[in-house]
Swiss-Prot record:
It comes from Candida glabrata (strain ATCC 2001 / BCRC 20586 / JCM 3761 / NBRC 0622 / NRRL Y-65 / CBS 138). This is Lipoyl synthase, mitochondrial. The keyword Iron applies. It catalyses: [[Fe-S] cluster scaffold protein carrying a second [4Fe-4S](2+) cluster] + N(6)-octanoyl-L-lysyl-[protein] + 2 oxidized [2Fe-2S]-[ferredoxin] + 2 S-adenosyl-L-methionine + 4 H(+) = [[Fe-S] cluster scaffold protein] + N(6)-[(R)-dihydrolipoyl]-L-lysyl-[protein] + 4 Fe(3+) + 2 hydrogen sulfide + 2 5'-deoxyadenosine + 2 L-methionine + 2 reduced [2Fe-2S]-[ferredoxin]. Keywords: 4Fe-4S, Iron, Iron-sulfur, Metal-binding, Mitochondrion, S-adenosyl-L-methionine, Transferase, Transit peptide. Binds 2 [4Fe-4S] clusters per subunit. One cluster is coordinated with 3 cysteines and an exchangeable S-adenosyl-L-methionine. [4Fe-4S] cluster 1 binds at C120, C125, C131, S366.
């Protein structure tokens, strides 16, 4: 019988390792009887495990007789190739330049000095250079993450740190944040928070206080708040909606069928819809907004159903972006959606009556948020003037 290359490699490596194991075992017999140190104990354990693996595998007779075909013997080089293929190559349309520019470095410096956290940095947003580094500061957008940089939840797509008991909120944070915003002269700012299920109010009053102080120090700055679901406590949604913000955002993240696999178990698709619905009911003039990631294995029908659910509660703005795996510990990318498909969903959103839709591989929930807001407010005013 003629052996294959894989089988020959297996036999050669097996023979060498067994010979080495026997010599090592013989050499260590005397010292072992006198009380083996930890290092020798570990070596003996490895030898035993190796012998067990050999006993479970095919014998020389199995190879000669042809019975070895029933055993799975993987070439180590082939296994390495298979592992590499699991990680899809990043398409060219997802590659971005290194962040730079005077405004970018100034924002970065101020954030560090005032001990603020930004989701732009914590979530490794690919658009940080574009949002922070523009020449016109009035069109720049910064997303400040309040209540610390540690979340009490563990969604499978998110790179933000997690802990059941994060540090207590910084009472000076609302004032520091407002000071930073007024110093930067930004036209639009997004406030977001980690989920703080450890706090009785989920951090709603802390976030609302920050909005109020920003409006006092920088009244011309438009404020968007991207909140959590407050564990379904709609009274906390009321607190946020009445704080004076301009846009109330809460992300669905994905379609209903994938929600249990993508988001933390304490989050829920219907629970998130209720947050957006309540915000609009509390302050009808508020622009409500959500974001959905693509590339997680969702179908077109599921996306359309999600959009229909959002329009049913009068959600105004939706954004679509490509899911990008932050680290190997996070869920894998199922598909890199092509730019043309994102254009399709943008057209579909307008067709369904959304006030605005930002859709593209690198789009995130706060991507060019100021530009989107201004454009849509102007469009809405034009429509109102025509009716008059």
């Amino acid at each position: 019988m003629r052996l294959t290359t894989v089988q020959r490699r297996f036999l050669v490596s097996t023979k060498a390792k067994v010979s080495g194991a026997s010599i090592s075992s013989t050499a260590n017999t005397g010292s072992a009887s006198a009380g083996a140190p930890n290092g020798q104990t570990r070596r003996r354990r490895r030898i035993t495990e190796f012998k067990d693996a050999l006993n479970l595998g095919p014998s020389f007779e199995d190879f000669v007789s042809g019975r070895a075909a029933g055993f799975t013997v993987v070439d180590p080089l082939e296994q390495m190739r298979q592992d590499r293929e699991e990680y899809k190559k990043l398409p060219k349309w997802l590659k971005v330049p290194i962040p730079k520019g005077v405004n970018y470095h100034k924002l970065k410096k101020d954030v560090k000095e005032l001990k603020l956290s930004t989701v732009c940095e914590e979530a490794r947003c690919p658009n940080i250079g574009e949002c922070w580094g523009g020449k016109d500061k009035s069109k720049a957008t910064a997303t400040i993450m309040l209540l610390g940089d540690t979340c009490t939840r563990g969604c499978r797509f998110c790179s933000v740190k997690t802990n059941r008991n994060p540090a207590k909120p910084d009472p000076t944070e609302p004032e520091n944040t407002a000071e930073a915003i007024s110093r930067w002269g930004l036209g639009y700012v997004v406030l977001t928070t980690v989920d703080r299920d450890d706090l009785p109010d989920g951090g709603a009053h802390h976030l609302a206080e920050t909005v109020i102080k920003i409006k006092q120090k920088a009244p011309k700055t438009l404020v968007e708040a991207l909140t959590g679901d407050f564990l379904g406590n709609l009274e906390m949604v009321d607190v946020m909606a009445k704080s004076g913000l301009d846009v109330y955002a809460h992300n669905l993240e994905t379609v209903e069928a994938l929600t249990p696999h993508v988001r933390d178990r304490r989050a829920g698709y219907r629970q998130s819809l209720n947050v957006l619905k309540r915000a609009k009911e509390t302050v009808p003039s508020l622009i409500t907004k959500t974001s959905v990631m693509l590339g997680l294995g969702e179908t077109d029908d599921q996306i359309i159903q999600t959009m229909q659910d959002l329009r049913a509660i009068n959600c105004d703005v939706i954004t679509f972006g490509q899911y990008m795996r932050p680290t190997k510990r996070h869920m894998k990318v199922v598909e890199y959606v092509r730019p043309e498909k994102f254009d399709y969903w943008k057209d579909k959103a307008k067709e369904m009556g959304f006030l605005y839709c930002a859709s593209g591989p690198l789009v995130r929930s706060s991507y060019k948020a100021g530009e989107a807001f201004i454009e849509n407010v102007l469009n809405k005013r034009k429509q109102d003037n025509k009716r008059i």
